[in-house]
Amino acid sequence: MEDQKTTNQVNLIQLHSLKWVDDELAMIQDQYSATLSAINFPCYTQSSSKTKDYLVVVDGKVYGMVREINCGNRFEYRALMADGNYIEPVSDIFHASAIDAVCELARRHHDNEFANQLTDYVIAVSQVQELASAQLRKNTKYLLSEHF
């Protein structure tokens, strides 16, 4: 009976210690809400069964398109100019999120302030995800050490 009580307490501590993630992400969302609300994806076309092209409009100005490619267990995103030509990403790899591709389009349109705001948003979210992942690894290690 004592072992079960200890396990339940550990699980509560683990869940409680990750509550900060939701709070942090909500603060980031609030901080960047004006930037994010400027982006519209008013329509898309289905290019193939695994590809969708989304029109990107920022503050009423057409920036181009974002191509979403379904790779089975993940999606890749590419920025396209309005004429359909790809913009090669700076890193030479496809983007893991549509926001990164929109950032690429913003830079192409010399909207560096907007691109920098999007980059800051992506970095802030990534940092929270990394910290949460580290906390989960720590909790898992702790739970495993308690039982084995």
Which ranges hold each PLM region?
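Negatively charged, low-complexity tracts enriched in Asp/Glu with abundant Ser/Thr
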Residues: E2-V58
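N-terminal cationic leader/targeting segments used for protein routing and processing
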Residues: T6-L12, C71, T140-Y142
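Generic short amphipathic/hydrophobic targeting helices enriched at N-termini
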Residues: T6-Q9, S17, H95-A98, L118, ...
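A short, exposed loop/beta-hairpin motif centered on an aromatic-Gly-Thr core
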Residues: A82-D100
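A contiguous, mid-protein "functional segment" used to position or interact
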Residues: F94-L118
